[in-house]
UniProtKB/Swiss-Prot annotation:
Involved in chromosome condensation, segregation and cell cycle progression. May participate in facilitating chromosome segregation by condensation DNA from both sides of a centrally located replisome during cell division. Probably acts via its interaction with MukB and MukF. It is found in: Cytoplasm, Nucleoid. This is Chromosome partition protein MukE. The keyword Nucleus does not apply. It comes from Vibrio vulnificus (strain YJ016).
Length: 231
């Protein structure tokens, strides 16, 4: 075993970090120690995960995650349509002036209100049930589903809880949901179009947003399976 790889694996941080990566977590610069470990041993750990037919990716924004291939020995996970939509809105908020005004902190209610404002409410209600009529009960169910999506995205490292009052900050890892932007385009406007049009997101060197961890060539974009092992 190469000396530097041995150093990385023997680091006391590595077992927990490895478990988080395998569970689909994104490691951003806010996670100082784990991010530093991945940065210091990126080459060695990339070779390590290749043995599992999995790629250790460092995104242009600086965060790390694992991308399993179709033959990977590491399980793949899929996000629901609502999870992806919430992720796109989080990315929009990350780019917004409101993030600076709020010192980077948002509430579950603010995210929900932004989601309602930016998308077709009828389409959102169909994510609750096809028979949804837009009643107060339907809206309450939708809010609970949005909270569930936020919990999933928190486990993936997209948001960071602030206290116990339903507040959170947004990680740069939400750029996994970012729109492709042509030179000269406004990135926030591009993200807004993406949300309103309900488009799939495909980056030149990134996987499709239909699956944060799936092989892009085999992913079914209509699959609505929830993340394995999460309530």
């Amino acid at each position: 075993m190469p000396e530097n790889l041995a150093k990385a694996i023997c680091n006391p941080l590595f077992p927990a970090l490895d478990s988080m990566l395998r569970a689909g977590r994104h490691i951003s610069s806010e996670d100082l120690d784990n991010h530093a470990l991945l940065s210091d041993y990126e080459v060695e750990l990339s070779a390590f995960y290749q043995r599992y037919n999995t790629e250790l990716v460092k995104a242009p924004e600086g965060f790390f995650y694992l991308r399993p291939r179709s033959t990977s020995l590491i399980a793949r996970s899929v996000l629901s349509e609502l999870d992806m939509l919430v992720g796109k809105v989080l990315c929009f908020l990350y780019l917004s002036p409101e993030r600076l005004a709020h010192e980077g902190i948002f509430t579950n209610q603010e995210l929900y209100e932004e989601l309602i404002a930016l998308t077709d409410e009828k389409k959102l209600m169909k994510l609750v049930t096809n028979r949804a009529s837009g009643s107060d009960l339907d809206r309450e169910k939708l809010f609970e589903k949005v909270r569930t999506s936020l919990r999933r995205l928190r486990r993936l490292g997209m948001i960071i809880n602030v206290g116990d009052s339903g507040k959170f900050s947004i990680s740069e890892a939400v750029f996994r949901f970012g729109a492709d932007v042509r030179a000269g385009d406004d990135i926030r406007e591009a993200q807004l179009r993406l949300i309103r049009d309900g488009e799939a997101v495909v980056h030149t060197q990134e996987p499709t947003q239909a699956s944060l961890l799936a092989d892009e060539e085999e992913q079914d974009y209509n699959e609505q399976a929830e993340l394995e092992g999460e309530a």
